[in-house]
Amino acid sequence: MSLFIQNDQQRQWMEKIGRIADEFQQTAAEDDEQGRFPAEKIQKLRDAGYTALTLPASHGGGGISVYDMLLFQERLARGDAPTALSIGWHLSVIGELGEGNSWDEDVFAFVAKEVQNGAVINRAATEAKTGSPTRGGRPGTHAVKKDGKWAVNGRKTFTTMSQALDYFLVTAWIEDKQTTGVFLIHKDDPGLSIEETWDMMAMRATGSHDLVLNEVMLDENKLVELLQGPRGAKPNGWLLHIPAIYLGVAQAARDYAVQFASEYSPNSLNGPIKNVPAVQQRTGEMELELLNARHFLFHIAQLYDDPVRRPHLTSELGAAKHIVTNAALSVVDKAMRIVGAKSLERTNPLQRYYRDVRAGLHNPPMDDAVIHKLAAEAFES
């Protein structure tokens, strides 16, 4: 990764995150096996100042760029992808809001102060009946005015990091306004609860349980956004944290396979299997796919970080997610082919990488939406 490190700040944080990732890796398999959300790891990231990095410097944060975030997140994911994905949602939400939000300045300043003090926030937008919010479905969660306050009722699924969040950004349909609003809700607000429903084969340690809202009463200023169209319609480079996670998983799989091939020497060969042409072929293919994915991802991040070039990005952000995620799937598959049947052992990290990397297919934007948009733009040009 030295090729992609551009300054001393990045180098210092990469060294710090590298140490944290290596520490987290020691218990990643146990967290996965138990389906346990590692709250202590999120606290470690809080204590390190990591959770305030994407907060603008004008509001007391680190003010890092999308490019910076991807560097750090990819490294963290090599050691512990579920933890990296979890905190990545917080980092991306704060980065997006700081870049250009329509919130009341006093409300954002309050949230910024909370983040400086270690608060963690995530959006809660997905529902069982609507699917991904990027598809544009109307949320079943609803908000109505009662005695000068907002009463919010509903249920959200896939609420990542639910057990560690201090604040939830909840989408709810407002009938009077005929649009979807976003409400800022604190974890201790009466009527809010977490139902532990998360039991997936992939990303088992993200604690993405259901958020249940039962007559949660909120002050008027807790309505912080009114959405115009489906979420995801506006280009958001901070969502590149998603492919960065799966690039990290792929790199971890590649590293394991290369080490295995360098050390494993069956008695049918005069040396390790790294000398076998088929192994060299697959290893070279892994390297090529990782090179393509990494360079494309970080180039798009650089374009997005440039305010002059950012408006010219159309489908590139979605294409980056598609290219990187599918390359990661392929790399993990090749790594398992190199290692062979041992990669299927429950104690082998490759089987965990295989399960975790598949979650990328179901993070936004979806592959079919990316391809459809590319085709539409081709015919409109």
Curated annotation (Swiss-Prot):
Enumerate the cofactors the protein uses.
Answer: FAD
Record's note on what induces expression: Induced by methionine. Repressed by sulfate via the cysteine metabolism repressor YrzC/CymR.
Enumerate the InterPro entries for this protein: Acyl-CoA_DH_C, Acyl-CoA_Oxase/DH_mid-dom, Acyl-CoA_Oxase/DH_mid-dom_sf, AcylCo_DH-like_C, AcylCoA_DH/ox_N, AcylCoA_DH/ox_N_sf, AcylCoA_DH/oxidase_NM_dom_sf
Gene3D superfamilies per UniProt: Acyl-CoA dehydrogenase/oxidase, N-terminal domain, Butyryl-CoA Dehydrogenase, subunit A, domain 2, Butyryl-CoA Dehydrogenase, subunit A, domain 3
Q: Which UniProt keywords apply?
A: FAD, Flavoprotein, Oxidoreductase
Task: Name the Gene Ontology molecular function terms of this record.
Answer: acyl-CoA dehydrogenase activity; flavin adenine dinucleotide binding
The record lists FAD as bound by: F158, T159, T160, R337, I338, V339, G340, A341
The EC number(s) attached to this protein equal 1.3.99.-
Spell out the family assignment given in the record's similarity comment: Belongs to the acyl-CoA dehydrogenase family.
**Name of the protein described by the UniProt record:** Putative acyl-CoA dehydrogenase YdbM
- Which gene underlies this protein? ydbM
